[in-house]
């Protein structure tokens, strides 16, 4: 009986590993040019515990552990439409105007998600913001349903990045900002 249990357990691990390996690595990269100095754009967007100040899809952003902008910090994002996303800060470079983070729990149709957010000066009043991520779909099965497939995962992250970057641009470029 112990032998049979060990075989079943080993097979289940093997099947899980094969499914994980079979699901393709997906990626999204979005950029936007903002008519403002890089320091101004970075100041508006750098706070790990402040995404809700410029991303229109968020109702709130709560730091649940750690210290803001310190590796290991964990934030809980509450979406306006319902649901939450928990993310962990993996890297923060103040001088380089960049941070890296991972999703650790989410209502989004993605898994194994890692992202980089970078603010790059293109001159006195011109800045490029790049938001990129690599991930897999949440449903790693062979035949995921519509809404759980690769397209749904890519579309969800594309929407997150596009709406966030568009609103960041609007806020930073607003008169008096």
Spans of model-derived segments:
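Bacterial N-terminal signal peptides
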Residues: 6-16
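Intrinsic-disorder/low-complexity, polar/charged segments enriched in Ser/Thr/Lys/Arg/Asp/Glu/Gln
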Residues: 25-33, 74, 84, 98, ...
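Hydrophobic/aromatic beta-strand elements that line small-molecule binding cavities or substrate pockets
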Residues: 30-32, 85-91, 105, 113-121, ...
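A short, structured loop/turn motif at beta-sheet edges
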Residues: 35-39, 90-97, 118-128, 170, ...
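Glycine-rich portal/gate segments that line the openings of hydrophobic small-molecule binding cavities
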Residues: 53, 62-109, 163-177
């Amino acid at each position: 009986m112990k032998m049979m249990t060990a075989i079943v357990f080993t097979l289940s691990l093997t099947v899980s590993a094969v499914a994980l390996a079979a699901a393709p690595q997906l990626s999204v990269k979005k950029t936007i040019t903002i008519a403002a100095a890089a320091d101004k754009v970075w100041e508006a967007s750098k706070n790990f515990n402040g995404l809700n100040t410029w991303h229109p899809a968020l109702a709130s952003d709560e730091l649940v552990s750690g210290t803001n902008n310190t590796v290991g910090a964990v934030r809980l994002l509450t979406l306006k439409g319902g649901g939450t996303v928990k993310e962990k800060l993996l890297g923060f470079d103040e001088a380089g105007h960049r941070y890296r983070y991972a999703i650790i729990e989410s209502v989004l149709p993605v898994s194994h998600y890692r992202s980089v957010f970078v603010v790059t000066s293109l001159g006195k009043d011109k800045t490029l913001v790049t938001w990129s991520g690599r991930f897999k779909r949440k449903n790693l099965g062979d035949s995921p349903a519509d809404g759980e497939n690769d397209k749904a995962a890519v579309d969800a992250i594309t929407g997150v990045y596009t709406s966030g970057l568009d609103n960041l641009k609007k806020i930073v470029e607003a008169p008096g900002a």
